[in-house]
Amino acid sequence: MAHYFVGDVQGCFAELKRLLAEVDFNPSRDELWAVGDLVARGPDSLATLRYFQSLGDAGKTVLGNHDLHLLALHGKLKRDKPSDNLAPLLNAPDIASLIYWLRQQPLMRELPEHKVIMTHAGVPPQWSLDVLRQESQLVSQALKQGDYLDALISQMYSDTAERWDPSAIGLNRLRFCINALTRMRYLYVDGHLDFDCKQPPEDCNNPQLRPWFEFTSALRQSHTLVFGHWAALMGKVNDPKLKALDTGCCWGEYLTLWHLEKDQKITQKKLKKG
């Protein structure tokens, strides 16, 4: 069995299928792990979600910020932007089933036998594996509740929950987890989240900011961390225990697949229309 990890698909379904054909992916024996942001901007978010839903146990994804935003759009809490190319998905006859499936997906997954952890944006350097599991589970529980729209999704958009506080309770605790696992790129030197800078480290001109993965982390010493979200990195991080897989396919660059057992990356250039 092979484990394949794919970067932010964001509706680039044709490129995903090309990659899977190249590696002879077979869901009866292999597993496909996705770093989240299955939807938005690319041309076929609907086919992407349907495909992952159809994989059953052979498909593993985590929620990204665009996936959570889709929940808000479906709940009429936000207005759809034409640039997100989500109208076909939102108007699909099976949208309710797809949304229900999405709500069952976690913010983190792990492959214990390989000591691999996957989230969308990364892991706060202050967190141990036990804390990561615990905080992710709290959000998952909230998403599975019948009142998830009012209790969580309608209130998750906040830049104020930028600092980890283990004594926090309720919504602020959930907000920090969502912000950290789906939006994080840089931290200030005191450890709180920045939500503005999206540039690669070499282009960041704020001396108070450092990429989250440059902070000391016991978890990163013991595990390989697989993440996406930060397209500007283009997969370039100087640490063999970090696998940055967002390489900007929806922006005209590449979709990246990582074969765990071979420690090999395979890329597919964005296909031209027509």
From Swiss-Prot:
<dbReference type="GO" id="GO:0008803">
    <property type="term" value="F:bis(5'-nucleosyl)-tetraphosphatase (symmetrical) activity"/>
</dbReference>
<dbReference type="Pfam" id="PF00149">
    <property type="entry name" value="Metallophos"/>
</dbReference>
<dbReference type="InterPro" id="IPR004843">
    <property type="entry name" value="Calcineurin-like_PHP_ApaH"/>
</dbReference>
<keyword id="KW-0378">Hydrolase</keyword>
<dbReference type="GO" id="GO:0005737">
    <property type="term" value="C:cytoplasm"/>
</dbReference>
<comment type="similarity">
    <text>Belongs to the Ap4A hydrolase family.</text>
</comment>
<dbReference type="GO" id="GO:0110154">
    <property type="term" value="P:RNA decapping"/>
</dbReference>
<comment type="function">
    <text>Hydrolyzes diadenosine 5',5'''-P1,P4-tetraphosphate to yield ADP.</text>
</comment>
<dbReference type="InterPro" id="IPR029052">
    <property type="entry name" value="Metallo-depent_PP-like"/>
</dbReference>
<protein>
    <recommendedName>
        <fullName>Bis(5'-nucleosyl)-tetraphosphatase, symmetrical</fullName>
        <ecNumber>3.6.1.41</ecNumber>
    </recommendedName>
</protein>
<dbReference type="GO" id="GO:0016791">
    <property type="term" value="F:phosphatase activity"/>
</dbReference>
<dbReference type="InterPro" id="IPR050126">
    <property type="entry name" value="Ap4A_hydrolase"/>
</dbReference>
<dbReference type="InterPro" id="IPR004617">
    <property type="entry name" value="ApaH"/>
</dbReference>
